[in-house]
């Protein structure tokens, strides 16, 4: 018999200490990694539930195991909410991650050796969009498209590459691009050569759900996303489509299960269902609007302090600081800010002279800081502190002074009150 009073703290002190230290780190550090966010206690309640015990290979109403009548309800709730939130008529909530969702799309629609057009990782793309070090870059012939001198996606280049190479699929989406993507233009280019348009909206799904960023679902053949990041749910993936192509939907379902995964994680799917419901609330829209406002406010401060922001602006939740003119590496900046309890990530910038392990930039995002209640006044102050550290990167007194300010503001704006 399992007793409900069993707990980690009494049983595994070493593990519990590490878990508790991470709780403290999250409360006492300002999180500016664009792909990170804080999920709600409701989502964590779902993820810590007894649903983790249930195997449920298959889909609602078509399972390979018995005893699935209640997890069928859970999964159907998640499916229905995903479709309603993003205006889709198909949703698969089973992918364990965004990467697995992406590979399900590739598996469903491509053959090894097929040509795809994806955003250059060095220009803001994602590993799974055809990077040579990723399986997507090894299985398929990848033609990268990029940004122009203004830092915007070069659609003329994209169209020319599409005409020249005739890819079977064009991949939209990004991990470090601060502009607005013209999904309709991308579909026009895809249609001109008879290609699929596949959009990975992982970074901006929350903004899209709140009508703060354009929705690709009406334009793309298939859309994937993670359920964390701006959507603020559990870590996991989601596939969406619209248009009524039942043959496509069957291919996508088969590519997820049995093609790429076995049993779904029902406790995580329950967390997705909760997060999708939360994303329909009025306060979620206000939150996403503030995420975008905060990113713009931070960019204004960096520009006023003489820092180079790639493209000079942001229209979503993130932006890149190009530190080449400051003679700093992203690795140095990341480490110095970390000592001040400000968490960012080093990131390559366009035409970066440094390796991906060093880089010449940092990526900054506002979802997590906004989640804890920061508004324009707080993020402007925060951006100023970041400038202070980067302008005095070897001055430990400056770093310590900023750290104390960070600790103070974190105490005033706790993640979990």
Swiss-Prot record:
The catalysed reaction is: (6R)-5,10-methylene-5,6,7,8-tetrahydrofolate + glycine + H2O = (6S)-5,6,7,8-tetrahydrofolate + L-serine
Needed cofactors, names only, are:
pyridoxal 5'-phosphate
Per UniProt, the keywords (alphabetical) are: Amino-acid biosynthesis, Cytoplasm, One-carbon metabolism, Pyridoxal phosphate, Transferase
Q: Which pathway does the protein contribute to?
A: One-carbon metabolism; tetrahydrofolate interconversion; Amino-acid biosynthesis; glycine biosynthesis; glycine from L-serine: step 1/1
One annotated Gene Ontology cellular component of this protein: cytosol
The primary location reported for this protein is cytoplasm
Record keyword Cytoplasm present: yes
GO-annotated biological processes: glycine biosynthetic process from serine; tetrahydrofolate interconversion
What are the site positions for Plays an important role in substrate specificity? 228
- Which top-rank group of organisms is this from? Bacteria
Signal peptide range in chain numbering:
none
Q: Subunit structure, per the record?
A: Homodimer.
The UniProt similarity line reads: Belongs to the SHMT family.
Q: According to its UniProt entry, what is the function of this protein?
A: Catalyzes the reversible interconversion of serine and glycine with tetrahydrofolate (THF) serving as the one-carbon carrier. This reaction serves as the major source of one-carbon groups required for the biosynthesis of purines, thymidylate, methionine, and other important biomolecules. Also exhibits THF-independent aldolase activity toward beta-hydroxyamino acids, producing glycine and aldehydes, via a retro-aldol mechanism.
The protein depicted here goes by the name Serine hydroxymethyltransferase 1
Its taxonomic placement starts with:
Bacteria, Pseudomonadati, Pseudomonadota, Gammaproteobacteria, Enterobacterales
